[in-house]
Amino acid sequence: MKDLKGTKTLENLLTAFAGESQARNKYTYYASKAKKEGYVQISNIFLETAANEKEHAELWFKLAHGIGTTEENLLDAAEGENYEWTDMYKEMATTAREEGFPEIAAQMEGVAAIEKEHEERYRKLAANIKEGKVFEREEKVLWQCSNCGHQLVAEKAPQLCPV
């Protein structure tokens, strides 16, 4: 495919991705509210539509951005989290405080602290992949099978669950 960089089409893809992503989240919130109010069928329709919107968002994201290896994706995610906690939420909190919304500013600062933890976690996971340490540790740790729950204390996770 032709390079999209600098095109209105790329801008449109990113706008479509953002819109579909926001719609998906909004519909899941609406589904929760409908279910709490006793409207299970309406809740299910919101959830079904949210799943559709997720697929639409993925289509636009793949065209606009692509999906790399897990290590590349972790580093990309870390960069996004870094921007959120170092720039975005800091600036938004400042604006909220200046406009007389200290409670919103405090919430944004609280979320910024969480985003910093997200960045650190993603960078550590990427380093584990790079160093070949995803399934091994320097000391014994608890490994648990994600299928059956079998637990093993060892330095390395087993290739296959012994159960």
Map each language-model feature to its residues.
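Non-heme di-metal
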Residues: 1-163
